[in-house]
Amino acid sequence: MVGFKNRYMLMEVFLDPDKDLLGEGTPIILTQFNLSKAIKDSILVNFGECGLGSSLGSFQVKYVNPITKLCIVRSSREEHRQVWLAITLVKSIGNCPVILNLLDISGCIRACRDTALKCDKEKFEQCSKSLSEEEIRQMNTSLEKIKLLEN
């Protein structure tokens, strides 16, 4: 039996620093659903229905941390460049302008998970003093979720 060959992309979401938030805090809560929708919309706009159909076979947003804004996206090996390009061309999630930065690309979930865990811990150490108790609880939940991440 032959397994599917996938690529896992670790990326970071930057909210647009030029947009004035007027004290609203974070304008959007990053979820698997809204990130997946933004990437699928980008694939549809840039590659058409055929490109979207070929990419959807194994496309999945595997992990999203709403505090550190790190995400893991899975795609097939054959279509990962197309998904990568579509990720690069995403300009907004909802009505919030964003920039998506690819940090790592890997052939197995374990290597990507380890890199994401390292990045999450470093970011958490940097911002832990300014987080509320609820955000710290949410961060710890995300760290536990990524440790359990497998196929």
Swiss-Prot record:
One of its GO terms (cellular component) is ribonuclease P complex. GO terms for biological process: tRNA 5'-leader removal. Pfam families: RNase_P_Rpp14. One of its GO terms (molecular function) is ribonuclease P RNA binding. InterPro entries: Pop5/Rpp14/Rnp2-like, RNase_P/MRP_POP5, Rnp2-like_sf. It is found in: Nucleus, Nucleolus. Keywords: Nucleus, tRNA processing. Disulfide bonds: none annotated. Disruption phenotype: Defective embryo arrested at the globular stage. Belongs to the eukaryotic/archaeal RNase P protein component 2 family. Component of nuclear RNase P and RNase MRP ribonucleoproteins. Interacts with GAF1/RPP30. Essential protein required during embryogenesis. Component of ribonuclease P, a protein complex that generates mature tRNA molecules by cleaving their 5'-ends. Also a component of RNase MRP. This is Probable ribonuclease P/MRP protein subunit POP5. It comes from Arabidopsis thaliana (Mouse-ear cress). The gene is EMB1687.
